[in-house]
Structures are given as structure tokens and as C-alpha cells.
């Protein structure tokens, strides 16, 4: 397992839709035990308990992709060294947008929502987001995420009892506007999810997937990774058999967590940036 070096000693973990920073609790403990400083900043205004967000989801409804990216940009530029950036699901999309801004020593998209340009939209992805997409008015709402929704989207490889307990601990309503931004990016000429996939001066990128993922099926994740093949910068892809979208708590999560960290440490040490990027924001 990789350990901190003089070049990289911090990992920034970015949660996705339907989740908060609490979803990283197991990864934080595992990475911290290896000597890393692990940061799990929430989306803007969402740095409160799951229970409070369920009672008052106003901060969720206000989310916009551009604002989320600006929020993490400020955090990362304030660090003394470029960190490893990892994001899950829509957090993986945010990680790719940060990569496009020249940030990070290495970036990992864990079952990431795709950037603009990926044309594939699998039926299971649509089903996972149906509670949001079925009503255009949800674009301006925080949309509830039920136990049944969680079972299909996150708990499809675990028992109903464990899925329900995980829903109780982790799940929050989804930011409808963010989901609509991602789902219809290819129809929006000014989409906030657009990146320059051909740039070669970026940090290394790893995209991971799970063979049983309903939200971001492996076919969608691999299509996202393939967009970057026109760049000479490092782009890697890894699919984990039997894994769902629940990377934070599915039994065996340690395998993906360890692989992601090992890959990122090695890639970051080879990339070896010396300062946090001051590249202009897109």
C-alpha cells in the first residue's frame, strides 16, 4: 500500500448525489491509518448531519454544478500541496471538472457521472434517476430518495436489511438541478460539465466501475474514460467484478479503496507537480 511521500500527503474525497461526507467514514479511517491527511469537504451548505438535511433540504435544492466546482477549487487551491482528488458518482464528475482546471496531483473518478460528450445513457441510470426526471419541476427541488430507491441504486448486491440500514445512515434527498444538468449536458452548449478531454498537461486520471452498478454501469464509466484517450496524459480504467454503486459500504469496499490509493500515489509521484495549479478557471 502506498504511503505519503514528500510529493503527496493529502487525499480529498468528494461525495455525490444522495449522499454526504458521512459516506466516506470507512475510507477516511483506512487512509488515515496509512498516514494520509484525509479531507471530506461537503458540497456548499451541506456540511451538516444527514438527519438535519432530511428535515430541511433547502441547501440541497440550491446546488449547481458550477458552484460546487468553485467551492472545491477554493479548498484545493488553499492547500500547501496538490492533493489526490477522489470523487464518487457526481463527485466523480466534480473531480473531472477540477482536473480540467489543472488541479490535483492525481484524480480518481469512482463510478463517476460522465462529463459532456458521453452519449450513452443506460436504462438502469434512467431508472435510478426516475424520481427526479419524471417531473420537470424537480429541477428546482431537493428530491426525496426512498428506501426502495436506495435498494435499487446502491443496495442491489446486499441484503434488504443492510440496504435499509445504510439508507438510514447515509441517504439524503438529491439536488434535482444537478441531476438535470448532468443528464441533459449534451443538449446544452454552455454545459457546466464540459471539459477539454484532449489536454495533455493535466494530472493522471483513473476511472473505476462496478460490474453490478445500476447508477453508473461499467459501460457508462468506460465510455467516460475513453473520451480521454486523445490525450497523452495518463488515463486508466479499472472495473471491479460484483461491485455496485455503494463504494462506501458494500462488503469488500476495501479492495477498491486500496487500489485507488495505490494507483493515485504511484501516478502522483510520477507526475510530481510542485505547486498547486494557478491555471485560470474555465
PLM regions and their residue ranges:
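Short beta-strand/loop motif that positions the catalytic acidic residue
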Residues: 201, 207-209, 213
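Conserved alpha/beta-hydrolase "acid-adjacent" motif
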Residues: 214-223
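Catalytic active-site module of serine/aspartate enzymes centered on a nucleophile-bearing elbow/loop
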Residues: 231-282
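Flexible "cap/lid" loop of the alpha/beta hydrolase fold
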Residues: 104-139, 180-187
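Conserved acidic catalytic loop of the alpha/beta-hydrolase fold
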Residues: 66-83
